Curated annotation (Swiss-Prot):
Residue ranges annotated for the HTH luxR-type domain, each copy included: 829-894
Family the entry assigns: Belongs to the MalT family.
Pfam families attached to this UniProt entry: GerE, TPR_MalT
Species this protein is from: Salmonella typhimurium (strain LT2 / SGSC1412 / ATCC 700720)
DNA-binding residue intervals: 853-872
Disulfide bond in keyword set: no
Protein name, UniProt field: HTH-type transcriptional regulator MalT
Gene behind this protein: malT
Biological-process GO terms, alphabetical: positive regulation of carbohydrate metabolic process; positive regulation of DNA-templated transcription
Record flagged with keyword Nucleotide-binding: yes
Annotated GO MF terms: ATP binding; DNA binding; DNA-binding transcription factor activity
Length: 901
């Protein structure tokens, strides 16, 4: 819940001096990216900018405090301020900020700018007290903000010092409007206006100018002069002499003498007690100070000129001038030290009553009241956890004694979930084990089950599926239905374990249950995770169309719940890329993989390994070996600088081994085979994949017998577990083994099986990647004219893809090849005496590649009748009568030229 006063522009008071010369300068702020107002405390930065902002509707105001160094809090308020300025235009960014569903501040800002691209009027955002920001991550994000904000957007920053926002660069590019302390200092005319409005008796212009010079135009000093003159009934000039040459560091003594010591005891205590509040309203004042009418007291303090300012148009929220507030808090620690804990307790209670638990925690921590802090956490910690207030929770839990956590074990559970969210898996188990050992009495069964659900999640994350399954089952046996979050966790883990074990049907059922529970209770990250798992299972089962449709539901969920910047979004676009690659939609697959890399742009490069693997796959399917090699260099560098799940390693090894196959690099394959551990099982898709990599390397090295043993066992496992996509891949690799070892009949048999299974999977690129050996076999099958219609259509599609992407592999008789052929000593005499034209050579190459007449016409962009003429001419020149004769003739020419076909 956001505090309204932090998003309210200060109210312009009637007795303030209108700074016309500075307002004129600010009037051109819309021509700059950044308007920067800097000066020490008390020079009137906020007052000036609030005057300038008056009447501007499309302006957001964000007043900072120390707590805004938390990235999530900063993001929430900043987006809320822009929403106020735009009337709710940036709803997606607002939802992402509220739900903490973004990868980083920069990625959230990138989404914000996408929405602001449709906003065409001038827009302003004021950030007050930016000097309070010390978090370098926020500084980096705001530099990004300034670089990429729309042209019609102006950021206005108020700060006591020069902020770390790339100021020099903006200044050089004339994108910075600056107002500093010298310009903010009152001139003689402004000082005269100020005293005329504040003092009951006017003073001469010369005296006013002299006092202005004495304090170097410092607005706070002028205000103190007027206040002191009114309180002490002395001349303003007397106060000015005391303030001459004073600065903020020596102001405390003056404020004690001239302000605190000149108010009655009741007002003094009111000032000191209320100063602990960063912002205040009637209810807070009543509780903290004991005054009966807090609103009336606040307005009275404001009228006395005691540095209290309204924070909103309604007059409900107030705050002290930062300089005076800081002074009062320091004095409160000295003068009311014994009462201070009780004052903070009262503040915490009032904030709780108004629904601001994070502010209440701030005061409970300041009070050192562990019992109050514990009670707040017991009632509100999980809500704060779900809103990613992780830093505040961690600080709070550290402030509680261990004994208090043991007495309230759900707080131990919360601390463990905090550790899990930070991937501190070993610490989670250590903490839970210690708690179980030291909790007095019999531990509640439900709590024990919640511990086990968390342990199960840690175990599966840490690559221990057996332990994860045991713990998940224990948790589900004991958890009541009402404990929905832990049940969602345990059900999800159990489903993931069954997926790893190859029990796809049961795993799919559990993931569907997880989705239903997660949607019902608005646990959106588990709903998304379950959909991703369902899609992977359906892919493994060979139901790629069903996997596609499940992915569509996941994309819709991401859109509806604004989950675009969760790392899981990368998982989804990656498995979409895998599916698109299988269907030979290579451009879309590549775009999807690149979007996955973009999602992870703020994470460690190692996280991008899977998407990079897919980019290599796309290059290999296109036959672009140079590009594949470049991408592989980066991939292999990442492999050497990280620890990865076996699934990631299997996918990375796959593209490496295929590349070695396509380039004939037996040395690299042999070295990899020597050092690669062989998995103990092959009961899921990633273990099947790694065994397939091993078999492919063995085939490349001519080790046909061990490769055949591997593939036959893989097929047996795949059939028993219904891993139909893996079976399709295994059959294709077995086909290559039979083809290269001269067992043509066996090769044809398994190829027919693979084509039939592809009617279910839709595979195209898995065939294409095998290149010319696959093309030759498909040509022969097409020529036999015995394939069923669907298999015939798929075979022709695969041939077109091979011809398009692997044309350098003999499918095209280009000019260089023809020239070498005609100069060959064994070229048939008929071709010498009646040579083919270049177009006729092209047609012969396409016939050899399995193209029909219509497809050849489309490829060469000529009429079908023209193709028939070319075919008739080349048949006559070659002395053949049928298409199959022409294919055989082309094959003989290729063999003569030394190509192994």
């Amino acid at each position: 819940m956001l505090i309204p006063s932090k998003l309210s522009r200060p109210v312009r008071l009637d007795h303030t001096v209108v700074r016309e010369r500075l307002l004129a300068k600010l009037s051109g702020a819309n021509n700059f990216r950044l308007a920067l107002v800097t000066s020490p405390a008390g020079y009137g930065k906020t007052t000036l900018v609030s005057q300038w902002a008056a009447g501007k509707n499309e302006l957001g105001w964000y007043s900072l405090d120390e707590g805004d160094n938390q990235q999530e809090r900063f993001a929430s308020y900043l987006i809320a301020a822009i929403q106020q300025a735009t009337g709710g235009h940036c709803s997606t960014s607002e939802a992402m900020a509220q739900k903490r569903q973004y990868a980083s501040l920069t990625s959230l800002f990138a989404q914000l700018f996408i929405e602001l691209a449709q906003w065409h009027r001038p827009l302003y955002l004021v950030i007050d007290d930016y000097h309070l920001i010390t978090n370098p991550v926020i500084h980096d994000a705001m530099r990004f903000f300034l670089r990429h904000q729309p042209e019609n957007f102006t950021l206005v920053v108020l700060s006591r010092n020069l902020p770390q926002l790339g100021i020099a660069n903006l200044r050089v590019r004339d994108q910075l409007l600056e107002i500093g302390s010298q310009q903010l200092a009152f001139n003689h005319q402004e000082a005269k206006q100020f005293f005329d409005r504040r003092l009951s008796s006017p003073i001469e212009a010369a005296e006013s100018s002299r006092m202005c010079d004495d304090v170097a135009g410092w607005a706070t000093a002028l205000q103190l002069i007027a206040l002191s003159a009114r309180q002490n009934h002395t001349s303003a000039h007397h106060s000015a002499r005391r303030l001459a040459g004073i600065n903020a560091s020596h102001l405390s003594d003056y404020l004690v003498d001239e302000v605190l010591d000149n108010v009655d005891v009741s007002t003094r205590h009111f000032l000191l007690k209320s100063a602990i509040l960063r912002s205040m309203n009637d209810a807070l004042i009543v509780r903290v100070t004991g005054e009966e009418n807090g609103q009336m007291r606040l307005e009275e303090i404001e009228r006395q000129g005691l540095f209290l300012q309204r924070m909103d148009d309604t007059g409900e929220w107030f705050s002290y001038h930062p300089l005076f507030g800081s002074f009062l808090r320091q004095r409160c620690q000295w003068e009311l030290a014994a009462e201070l804990p009780e004052i903070h307790r009262a503040a915490a209670e009032s904030w709780m009553e108004q629904g601001f638990p994070s502010e209440a925690i701030h005061h409970a921590l300041a009070a050192g009241d562990a019992q109050m802090l514990r009670d707040i956490l017991l009632n509100h910690a999980w809500g704060l956890f779900n809103h990613s207030e992780l830093a505040l929770l961690e600080e709070s839990l550290k402030a509680l004694p261990w004994e208090s956590l043991l007495e309230n074990p759900r707080l131990v559970l919360l601390q463990a979930w905090l550790m899990q969210s930070q991937h501190r898996y070993s610490e989670v188990n250590t903490l839970l084990a210690r708690a179980e050992q030291e909790i007095k009495g019999v531990m509640d069964g439900t709590l024990h089950a919640e511990f086990n659900a968390l342990r199960a999640q840690v175990a599966i994350n840490d690559g221990n599926p057996e332990e994860a399954e045991r713990l998940a089952k224990l948790a589900l046996d004991e958890l009541p239905l009402a404990w929905f979050y832990s049940r969602i966790v345990a059900t999800s883990v159990h489903g993931e374990v069954l997926h790893c074990k190859g029990d796809l049907s049961q795993s799919l059922s559990l993931m569907q249950q997880t989705e239903q529970m997660a949607r019902h209770h608005d646990v959106w990250h588990y709903a998304l995770w379950s959909l991703i798992q369902q899609s992977e299972i359906q892919f493994a089962q060979g139901f790629l169309q069903a996997a596609w449709e499940t992915q569509e539901r996941a994309f819709q969920l991401i859109k509806e719940q604004h989950l675009e910047q969760l790392p899981m979004h990368e998982f989804l676009v990656r498995i979409r890329a895998q599916l698109l690659w299988a269907w030979a939609r290579l451009d879309e697959a590549e775009a999807s993989a690149r979007s996955g890399i973009a999602v992870l742009s703020t994470f460690q490069p190692q996280q991008q390994l899977q998407c990079l693997t897919l980019l290599v796959q796309c290059s290999l399917a296109r036959g672009d070996l140079d590009n594949a090699r470049s991408q592989l260099n980066r991939l292999e560098n990442l492999l050497g600088n990280g620890r990865y799940h076996c699934d990631w390693i299997s996918n990375a090894d796959k593209v490496r081994v295929i590349y070695w196959q396509l380039t004939g690099d037996k040395k690299s394959a042999a070295n990899w085979l020597r050092h690669t551990p062989k998995p103990a099982f092959a009961n899921n898709h990633f273990l099947q994949g790694q065994w397939r990599n091993i078999a492919r390397a063995q085939i490349l090295l001519g080790e046909f017998e061990p490769a055949e043993i591997v593939l036959e066992e893989l097929n047996e496992n795949a059939r028993s577990l219904r891993l139909m996509s893996d079976l399709n891949c295994n059959l294709l690799l077995l086909n290559q083994l039979y083809w290269q070892s001269g067992r043509k009949n066996d090769a044809q048999r398994v190829l027919l099986d693979a084509l039939q299974l592809a009617n279910r999977t839709g595979f195209i690129s898995h065939f294409v990647i095998e290149g010319e050996a696959m093309a030759q076999q498909l040509r022969q099958l097409i020529q036999l004219n015995t394939l069923p219609e669907m298999e015939q259509h798929r075979a022709q599609r695969i041939l077109r893809e091979i011809n398009q992407h692997h044309r350098h592999k003999f499918a095209h008789f280009d000019e260089g090849f023809v020239e070498r052929l005609l100069n060959h000593p064994d070229v048939p005499e008929l071709i010498r005496t009646s040579p083919l034209t270049q177009r006729e050579w092209q047609v012969l190459g396409l016939i050899y590649s399995g193209y029909s007449n219509e497809q050849i016409a489309g490829e060469l962009a000529v009429a079908a009748t023209t193709i028939k003429t070319h075919i008739r001419n080349l048949y006559q020149k070659l002395g053949v009568a049928h298409r199959q004769d022409a294919v055989q003739h082309a094959q003989q020419l290729l063999k003569m030229m030394g190509y192994g076909v």
